[in-house]
UniProtKB/Swiss-Prot annotation:
Gene name tied to this protein: valS
Reactions the enzyme catalyzes: tRNA(Val) + L-valine + ATP = L-valyl-tRNA(Val) + AMP + diphosphate
Record-level Gene Ontology MF annotations: aminoacyl-tRNA deacylase activity; ATP binding; valine-tRNA ligase activity
Biological process, per Gene Ontology: valyl-tRNA aminoacylation
Organism: Bacillus cereus (strain ATCC 10987 / NRS 248)
Lineage of producing organism: Bacteria, Bacillati, Bacillota, Bacilli, Bacillales
Pfam families: Anticodon_1, tRNA-synt_1, Val_tRNA-synt_C
Record InterPro entries: aa-tRNA-synth_I_CS, aa-tRNA-synth_Ia, Anticodon_Ia_Val, M/V/L/I-tRNA-synth_anticd-bd, Rossmann-like_a/b/a_fold, tRNA-bd_arm, tRNAsynth_Ia_anticodon-bd, Val-tRNA_synth_C_sf
Enzyme Commission code: 6.1.1.9
The family this protein is said to belong to: Belongs to the class-I aminoacyl-tRNA synthetase family. ValS type 1 subfamily.
UniProt-recorded name of the protein: Valine--tRNA ligase
Coiled coil: 810-881
Subunit structure as annotated in this protein's UniProt entry: Monomer.
Span(s) of short sequence motif 'KMSKS' region: 526-530
Amino acid sequence: MSNTEKNLPTKYDHMSVEEGLYQWWLEGKYFEATGDEKKQPYTIVIPPPNVTGKLHLGHAWDTTLQDILTRTKRMQGYDVLWLPGMDHAGIATQAKVEGKLREEGISRYDLGREKFLEKAWEWKEEYASHIRQQWGKVGLGLDYSRERFTLDEGLSDAVNKVFVQLYEKGLIYRGEYIINWDPATRTALSDIEVIHKEVQGAFYHMNYPLTDGSGHIRLATTRPETMLGDTAVAVHPEDDRYKHLIGKTVTLPIVGREIPIIADEYVEKDFGTGVVKITPAHDPNDFEVGNRHDLPRILVMNEDGTMNEKAGKYNGMDRFECRKALVKDLQEAGVLVEIEPHMHSVGHSERSGAVVEPYLSTQWFVKMAPLAEKAVALQQKEEEKVTFVPERFENTYLRWMENIHDWCISRQLWWGHRIPAWYHKETGEVYVGTEAPADIENWNQDNDVLDTWFSSALWPFSTLGWPNEDAADFKRYYSTDALVTGYDIIFFWVSRMIFQGLEFTGERPFKDVLIHGLVRDEQGRKMSKSLGNGIDPMEVIEKYGADAMRFFLSTGSAPGQDLRFSMEKVESTWNFINKIWNASRFVLMNMDDMKYEEIDLTGEKSVADKWILTRLNETIESVTRNMDKYEFGEAGRSLYNFIWDDFCDWYIEMAKLPLYGEDEAAKKTTRSILAYVLDQTMRLLHPFMPFVTEKIWQHLPHEGESITVAAWPTVREDLQDAEAAAEMHLLVDIIRSVRNIRAEVNTPMSKKVQMQIKAKDEAVLAQLTKNSSYIERFCNPSELTIQTDLQAPEKAMTAIVTGAELFLPLADLINLDEERARLEKELEKFDKEVERVQKKLSNQGFVAKAPAAVIEGERAKEQDYLEKREAVRQRLADLEK
């Protein structure tokens, strides 16, 4: 990057700083993996966002963490591949495209499958472009030369191969099962696509008559319309109330079908009446009970949520209309004995909002137990296991794997990977293969597509060229080093990538999984459309810049924890960047056209020089160690404290002494140290704030084209000086103590005062004498005395620091008579306040009627006034000493 400006602009403007830099990085190909065999590879594949719209704050957080990792590793000399890509997001994208078509007054059926898919691809191209623009705004160092999409030809080949191989191993089968069914979109849903909401419903209590006429058995349901498909009534085998009824039958009300009373341990004896209706075609638990007892499965609904011919006279009714009509009929028949209001959790489709129906359907499934077994066994092998950060999420993962159910992988959609299965038109024979049958005219392909998570589970290796195991990228960059993702998709995605990676590559797909939480608002609420508390990251970037947003997101919480988003804290980060900018301007204005090769750290150094270089070493060690542990918050805090406190507030101020002095050698050393420390600090900060660090670094004396490929700082033992650091700590303590004393008595720093320091021994005396110029510069004494045998003066403000005692005579600081009068007036004011609040708190009427928070507030005031009064009394006493 050519740079003709000697100095940075006067004001930090994030928009002008970030403008154009990303494109310059892309043109320089700094983010492209080189394949350099001399370097160790480091690989991350991006969790692919859905091509359904804009990225949200969760995406910004997730990708910022990945960018921090990959930028750091690139600077540390790794051959970094951060592979970008997007997910076709089957149902989500299809719902969006269908919604757009509805606005035009047409449906997907009007278009037909091929034309509809053309529309879906048009949508994908438009929104993929938006997502790339947003990635650029955040500053993500992605290798676009390797960008992938889950419906790419190569990835589709991988999907088909995996399906066929699992089918041939008997691990994919077609069968009936209860799935989450969305009647509005007419497709199966994964658990993650079901949103549970608290809904006001009811328990419908009914009497089912015993067929022999000897009485009835009472039970309750929240879905009375499903009783039309009941095939049994169940009780617990050890429930003494019903043991005598096991094996008998009841007559299903309205329907008149005779069904058995069975015993099953699924029933909870102590819940309700201890009797449950069993509807195997409309409830997952009932389905399992039905399998154990060989019960028939009677499906009483159509795919659109209307009742079918098995529902008798309710055939054709919407399921909820059927509920109303059936309840009325049950009441009239005297079967319904009570309707008990009941709030309960009901699943709704994330896409359509429709109430999800547990529904018996013929679907394709993956047999999970054998696959999960291998994944669980892997975690026993210390060198080969997947490491979860934080570690507690490994238990979450293992618990799910050990209690896993078969996975429904078919979806009744058009957008997605079409299932590679064909049915013979005459014989019904099923053919599964990566290629269509040779006599294709005699076969019909399965209309369904695969669950989006099926292709996503192959993402770490399909994106690198598998199933071609000789592909250069697959051989070099697999398995990947880290996956960064939220805890909400450990089950749906992380676990599936692990077992598919093991099954098809024989290796874990990634070494580490860094888990983060969810982005919440300042009140801790989940961001959602209904609450209206969502925040667009692009708006944050426009207002405060990507660097400020990134630093807040990456340092605002610990691994595995949720993040409370605060615009105020992003603004504070912007202020921090502004301070860095101003400090950098000061450094650059004092460089005197210094070239990179002129930076010389071998000259004689002051205690401040040695200290800042030692603190830089400590910061390099801390940042590097915490980055290796994924503790980005700790790394960021180390940098913040070093830059704000050590470099800006102390060293730059101390550097002004030699810079504005006459000693040319000292000036040169100071310039070199300023340039070196700022250069190293910008490198450490670069993964967090890529834009502003590149801008500043380009103005500094440097070698190389871009900070993105500059070497990561390392600790230099030759610049470590513990003694100088201790000396500096003493100086800082003295200066701070003097400033505190002046603030306490309202004496400005501009007023000169006597200052006496009693050193505890000759060594401290020598240190303070040698560094007295700093004390004179920052404490502004009219006279400075440093001795080991100093007698404490009368009427002086004092402070004790490690190794020394300070005295500032009061007569120099204040007019004693005026200060005494002022303090007495203060004391009188606090006496009145204490009396007022204590009188209020002793009033029994007030205490009895006032809210607890108000009383607590008054007690806090009392404590505050008492402490302030005591401080004033102490100050008055000090004046009399």
